[in-house]
Amino acid sequence: MGADRGRGGRRRPARVVAYAVGGVVLLAGCAAMPDSGDLRGVESTPRQDPQVRVFAMPPREDAPPADIVQGFLEALTSDDPHYETARKYLTGDAAKSWRPDESATVLAGGPGTESDHSGNREDANDYSVTLTGTRVATVDAQQSYAPADGVYRESVHLTRDGKSKQWRIDSLPPGVVMGKSDFQRNYMSVNRYYFASNTPVRAAAETGPVREPAAVADPVYVRRRVDPMTQVVRSLLSGPTSLLGPVVRSSFPTGTALAKNAGSLAPDDRSKLTVPLNDKAARAGADKCDEMAAQLLFTLQNLTPAVQEVELRSGGEQLCSLSEDRAETVATRGSAQRPDYLYFVDDQDRLVRIAAGSNGTRAEPVPGPLGEGHQALRSVAVSRDEHSAAGIGLDNKLLYVGSLVSGGSLGDPVLASQGKTESDRLTPPSWDAQGDLWIADRNPADPRLLLLKEGAGDPVEVRTPGLDGRVQAVRVAADGVRIALVVEKDGKRSLLIGRIERDGKAGDVPAVTVLELRSATPELEEVTAMSWAGDARLVVVGRERGGVQQIGYVQVDGSTPEASVPAALTGVKEIAATEDERLPLVAYSEDLIVRLPSGLQWQKVTEGTAPVYPG
């Protein structure tokens, strides 16, 4: 810690001195405190060891202003729960008004320091320093991450106390600031779960219209080693981020919070977590309580597999209890839905399939007209219940929808593009969890994002205020409230993530809008292909400016998840994944369908194109 400082800044080596006091190890400067083993100095590199906690020491007596600033920056990256050590570098008034949880600014190489030599004299009573760096990201008060760029320059002012003669900071930027590697070591991303407010998921069962609420992942960043389980529960109860707020709901009654005596939360030896709540939670009925427990269980299992059951209590009485087996009957998550088949177009231009997750290499035509070969196909999409499929003809001009049941006929195309060339016509389609079909028409004279209700009828033009560019690819998330678009502008293809809002009553023609489109890959100049690969994660094929094509994962907020990078593969034109992360990636490369089983290298499946999982 502390090595992540700007090169132009003044750098003093951290002092690492250990004192044993009543069995407690105190470290001067910054150091790591393992639960067992030897003390060691702290390097500013990503560390995944959950047993290591880092603490800073307060300012030493008569420390000069530069050391006070340096020590404060060091303390910001420690595991001090309430930043009490960092506050000791501030004046009394500044310590009271400083809100470290207000924001976090992440810099590429850490903050450098520039002294204001024109006005600084250590023999005077005030001193100014400018923190400098290059912005990478910000985390706001809701713990929501967003990529950022540009120059960072913020002033820090110090004053010398008239009585103690000690230098302290009396004016500083809001929140905390640190380098990227310190941020990766100190913070972790966790998906909180809420429910789509107006988009229940169509049940996979063939009988009955039962619809379950769709669970929606809302990623936030929490401090990795500062009681993350309790942090995450408090964060979930505080409500969704503003980006998702208009389209999700929480089942917790307004005002629900942890009970005052809740303390630190941890599961028992039976993997059950008991969550004591205040009296507001007692107003929920049995069904709502199950939904509350499901929100907690989905969220906590994203943090750790150690939680397999959640019990909610209020006023000393049990409200409800929910196990992971029963949680899937309360709400549906994309990551919990395992598709039956992988689909692609074979060398006879038919829609074919192979059992998902199998080692098989022999595909079979799907039942129904799209598997019979009467209509040659260029690209396809299969509904999430695997009962219907959509296909684009070879010239990208016509869209067909057919049943995956033997004996059916294909019928007329449901959509036609008037674009003059193949690249100016229809994109591959995508099905949402409600059974509706999405597609973009790339016709330069009339570019549109379209929705076909249940894959039929007149297409509804989706409003896209603020969209600057032409849509080249469409993928709707399993939760039904997020959409991923590859958008081309001025020769650059970017991945944008937006929020889907639907207006209108059941049975009416919906008014559909995609809002708050944000770049998830600002560093990539060319996005070739993408697919959803988790509740809040995508796999992306692309390249940086002047670089070579690569495959990687990205979170919906634009951050990089803690996941292994897929093995390299050249010439990738299409890629398929599923929200169930246990299933292999599948790609179209060099005229072949290939797959990547977990921990292995890419393997040839067979000849073909356009691989897709349902969705």
From Swiss-Prot:
Domain of life: Bacteria
Main location: membrane
Signal peptide range in chain numbering: 1-29
Keywords, ordered alphabetically: Cell membrane, Lipoprotein, Membrane, Palmitate, Signal
Membrane topology summary: Lipid-anchor
Stored InterPro entries: GerMN, Lipoprotein_LpqB, Lipoprotein_LpqB_C, Quino_amine_DH_bsu
Lipid modification (S-diacylglycerol cysteine), residues: 30
GO CC annotation terms, alphabetical: plasma membrane
SMART domains for the chain: Germane
Family: Belongs to the LpqB lipoprotein family.
The protein, known as: Lipoprotein LpqB
